[in-house]
Amino acid sequence: MIHRKRVLFLVVLIGAIFFVNIYVVSFRETSKTAVYRYDPSESIPLLLLGGLRGIAVDFLWARAIARHEEKKYYELLTINNLIAKLQPDFPAVWIFQAWNMAYNIAHEWDAARNKWKWIHTGLNFAKKGTVKNPASGDLFFELGYMYLHLFDQRVFKYAAYYREQLKQEDGEDNYEASLYWLRRALLHDPKLHNVLAIERTICHALWHASLCAEREENIDKALQYAELALNEWKTYHTNHPDDTSTNVSEFMSAIEKKKEFLQRLPRRDVW
């Protein structure tokens, strides 16, 4: 009997919260303030939970940590999606979960195919987050950095495989994707990342793109990226002449030498 009363009380409570939130949403929609439009599959759970959303999120985070420690990664993915639905407008949620999948979980696998599956899942998760947070410079930067770092052959054994899979599955070049998101980050006032650091990362991305094109024997492309990298560093040095955190002259000298070397090689245009 007591159990039935508790269940009935919870049902009534949830119903009350639902209708109160309907009223609040209705009020917001009639005001002049712009309100982000969630799709129905996301807005209904948010309305139902109302003030209990914080408790639900805390519970899900605890579950996520437990599933990660238990190496139950597919259950973890489901929980990640639930957390993102409950906190869609918090960029940190998307950043943390994307990094966890693309780095930590991917590291747990041995086969390149399995690693790539989780890297790809993490990238797509972050990209979904950019749709929900279209003005988050920090999320844009993290995604741009992931497209640069995860495909670095000096760091990751299967980076060349990841690069090829990205081309086949998404039709994307990781360096172009990296540059796209890094440049978007500069346009949206990042809160957690220094603008100078983002500008330097763009310079490095262009340089790594040139080196990668050289390895792939696409000399024309390597030269074009080298020229872009050199111009980017020159612009950076002009805009920030007092910055001593990076030896810009050393980078520009290395690029100039690489350009001279590439110009002596036979061309093979495979754009």
Feature names for model-found ranges:
Residues 1-5:
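Short, Lys/Arg-rich N-terminal segment immediately upstream of the first membrane anchor
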Residues 6-23:
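Hydrophobic membrane-insertion alpha-helices, especially the h-region
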Residues 27-83, 89-133, 141-228, 232, ...:
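Short coil/linker segments at helix-helix boundaries
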